[in-house]
Amino acid sequence: MKVNLDRNSSGFCFGVQSTINVAEEKLRKEKGLYSLGDVVHNEVEVKRLEALGLITIDTPAFNELKNAPVLIRAHGEPPSTYETANRNNLTLTDTTCPVVAKLQRTASQLNELGYQIIIYGKHLHPEVIGINGHCQNRALIIKHADLSDPEETLPIDLSKKTALISQTTMDVSGFYELKKNLEKLFSKGGRETGPWAEVKSIGEAEPMPEFIFKDTICRQISNRNQKLQDFSRANERIIFVAGKKSSNGQVLYAICKEANPESHFIEDVEELQSEWFTTTQGKTVESIGVCGATSTPMWLLEKVANHIEAHYA
């Protein structure tokens, strides 16, 4: 059996890697560093950092914290977090991903211009909560690109000028499917919008079109998709490693599963199953591909690959 480790389209994205680097550097110098929420959506990596002294807290605990250092993770935070930090004399180390920070500014600008903002994303994802905070929590969140959830579509005001943006880790095809379906929805509601206008920069065109979209999906993440498809097809079986909380992990695993139905999702080596490494005829499979999400550390992927070689090859 040959075990192939994907080093090209798996492992931390630059935003997460930067956060981890800063956290490690801080922990080498001082103990008692707090992280507002899981520093990354990977439980194994979180436990490693907690063993170094990182203390993970939720929002209620953060609101009660006083005179302490706190790490803002790559997902970013709403303005209310910074206001609380100022009141409670908290020292923030802000590692918001630059791509996310730019998106937060975009949401704020669109709100100031009076747009109804629709975010393609997951309602409770911390990045989405942060983005929504930067537009006074006025955005409408839509997860289902086919507009199949009435709870998501009923709040849409068809009479308002509207802008569509996206959580950075959502799938590109879903974003453009949602754009197309929104165009149809507004047309059925009596607004002949035609194709919505794509904007690169907010506020530069005067006047701004009434119905616009800005593709805010991170290309470092989305560009991994084709490589991951190719990697999945090139191996007989796929072991996909990611945290259960990882939004990006769910998207990338679905890509692997579509390309190779013999794909299996794990968080750590304890979840590996021996039957994954044999054929129905009882023979050892020829190739195993190990890959993961942008929130999966390379050391964990290496650990899984080495474990497979040691116990199943």
Swiss-Prot record:
Dimethylallyl diphosphate binds at H41, H75, H125, S246, S247, N248, S295. Its cofactor is [4Fe-4S] cluster. (2E)-4-hydroxy-3-methylbut-2-enyl diphosphate binds at H41, H75, H125, T168, S246, S247, N248, S295. Coiled coil: none annotated. CDD domains: lytB_ispH (cd13944). Isopentenyl diphosphate binds at H41, H75, H125, S246, S247, N248, S295. Binds 1 [4Fe-4S] cluster per subunit. It catalyses: isopentenyl diphosphate + 2 oxidized [2Fe-2S]-[ferredoxin] + H2O = (2E)-4-hydroxy-3-methylbut-2-enyl diphosphate + 2 reduced [2Fe-2S]-[ferredoxin] + 2 H(+); dimethylallyl diphosphate + 2 oxidized [2Fe-2S]-[ferredoxin] + H2O = (2E)-4-hydroxy-3-methylbut-2-enyl diphosphate + 2 reduced [2Fe-2S]-[ferredoxin] + 2 H(+). The keyword 4Fe-4S applies. Transmembrane segments: none annotated. GO terms for molecular function: 4 iron, 4 sulfur cluster binding; 4-hydroxy-3-methylbut-2-enyl diphosphate reductase activity; metal ion binding. One of its GO terms (biological process) is isopentenyl diphosphate biosynthetic process, methylerythritol 4-phosphate pathway. Its EC number is 1.17.7.4. Disulfide bonds: none annotated. Keywords: 4Fe-4S, Iron, Iron-sulfur, Isoprene biosynthesis, Metal-binding, Oxidoreductase. HAMAP family: IspH. Catalyzes the conversion of 1-hydroxy-2-methyl-2-(E)-butenyl 4-diphosphate (HMBPP) into a mixture of isopentenyl diphosphate (IPP) and dimethylallyl diphosphate (DMAPP). Acts in the terminal step of the DOXP/MEP pathway for isoprenoid precursor biosynthesis. This is 4-hydroxy-3-methylbut-2-enyl diphosphate reductase. It comes from Chlorobium phaeovibrioides (strain DSM 265 / 1930) (Prosthecochloris vibrioformis (strain DSM 265)).
